[in-house]
Amino acid sequence: MEMKKRISLELRNRSPAEVAELVLDNCRSVDGEIEGLNDSYKELEFLSMANVELKSLSKLPKLPKLRKLELSDNSISGGLDVLTERCPNITYLNLSGNKIKDLSTVEALASLKNLKSLDLFNCEITNLEDYRENIFQRLSQITYLDGFDQEDNEAPDSEEDDDDDDYDDDEEPGPRRYEAEEDEEDEESASDLGEEEEEEEEVGLSYLMKEEIRDEEDDDDYVEDGAEGEEEEEEDEEDEAAAADQGEKRKRDPEDEGDEDED
């Protein structure tokens, strides 16, 4: 796919002034030149044109906010002074896998005062004697060369990690902001869960209290029923005793009458 067509696809119905990041890797440049980019991309901060058969940067537009530029695996051999004129705020530049041979070619980057990381890996220039010492000497502003500083300490995974806080509120948040939002959501979920558990405990206690009250009422009813039963049994025993006494009296009455007749 040609670079110009690829750019139109990457816009996704946005205007060039709304684009902060543009990845054009593996498309095809025409005659090794940049095409489809213009000064309208004034908000562009990240541009990647890796493996696009690029030979020249002469048609690179003015990109005042560009901070990271990926140009790896192309055929660029010079003309780096264009970067100092049109992209003065670059902090990261990847030229690995290009045809850069001489230190004089790289010296043009000395005017990029904000440049912190430069990658020339797999370029012929890396075969020069004292290559690293010479680059650090000529480009005193850089911290990392081919991923390592002068003390051979490896660079962080991304030079943009420290720049996440620079985004405006209306721009896309960085990964840290997403993580913060996720943490807040987790805390809210945990809080909601805690409240639900408290409510469940309150409901459970209320239920137990009601059950205890019901049990006490049932015990009282049982006691009252038992007392009534005992009273009824006592009344029945009294009735039986009275009936027995009456029967004995009836037996005695005929005997008494017989005694009177004999007299």
Swiss-Prot record:
One GO CC annotation: cytoplasm
LRR repeats: from-to residues: 43-64, 65-84, 89-110
Entry PTM: Phosphorylated. The phosphorylation is nuclear localization signal (NLS)-dependent.
Highest taxon above the source species: Eukaryota
Location of the region described as ZID domain in the Swiss-Prot/TrEMBL record: 202-263
Domain named LRRCT: residues: 123-161
Keyword line: Chaperone, Chromatin regulator, Cytoplasm, Leucine-rich repeat, Nucleus, Phosphoprotein, Repeat
One example GO MF annotation: histone binding
Statement: the UniProt record of this protein carries the keyword Repeat: yes
Subunit organization: Component of a SWR1-like complex. Interacts with H2A.Z/H2AZ1.
UniProt note: domains: The H2A.Z-interacting domain (ZID) mediates a direct interaction with H2A.Z/H2AZ1.
Name of the protein in its database record: Acidic leucine-rich nuclear phosphoprotein 32 family member E
Source species of the chain: Xenopus laevis
Origin organism lineage: Eukaryota, Metazoa, Chordata, Craniata, Vertebrata
